[in-house]
Amino acid sequence: MSYSVSAAQLWSRKLAMQAEDMQQHQKSQSNQIASCLAEMNTKQEVVNQTIGQLGRSISEVQQQNSQLVLQSLNQINMSMQQVALGIQDYASRINKLEQTMSDMNLKFEALQKEQNSNTKTLADCTSQMTIITKKLDAELKKRYMTTKQTRTVQNQTMPRSNTTTKKRVLAIDFLADDDY
């Protein structure tokens, strides 16, 4: 029996060694699983942090984009208002300019009518002056002829100078022009 005890001992030792090997194997597998789980947890935390950072970044970018869009829309709105005001100002200036032009056209037409009437008046005055000048010339010739024919002997000895006669003719013309 000692052989069988020894076989039983061997067998129990073998089983104990196998159990110990299995325990160590399970322990190493448990350690590997624990380290794998720890690594997965750390990686999950990194992923969660990255996802959180990405989420925050996305929300920040969305906020910035929405702010930029709002600012751009406000600037466009202000620009449109300025353009509208500019157009209104331009339209009022054009209206004033058109009004000024129509006023100037009316004044120009009035000036043309006045000029036409003045031209007619001037033409009438010129024709009247021509008639008056012809009459005066005729009267002067008559006077000159009568004065020459009725000269006395004393006057004939002292002939008049040309300048005195010219002065008299100019004086008569001057008086005729002023309607004296």
Curated annotation (Swiss-Prot):
Keyword Nucleus: yes
Phenotype of gene-disrupted mutants: Abolishes localization of hop1 to DNA double-strand break (DSB) hotspots.
Keyword Repressor: no
Localization per record: Nucleus; Chromosome
Subunit and interaction comment: Homomer. Interacts (via C-terminus) with hop1 (via C-terminus); the interaction is direct. Interacts (via C-terminus) with rec10; the interaction is direct. Interacts with mde2; the interaction is direct.
Role of this protein: Required during the early stages of meiosis for meiotic recombination.
Major localisation: nucleus
Keywords tagged on the record: Chromosome, Meiosis, Nucleus
Single Gene Ontology BP annotation: reciprocal meiotic recombination
Protein name per the record: Meiotic recombination protein rec15
Superkingdom per UniProt: Eukaryota
Any one GO CC term of the record: chromosome
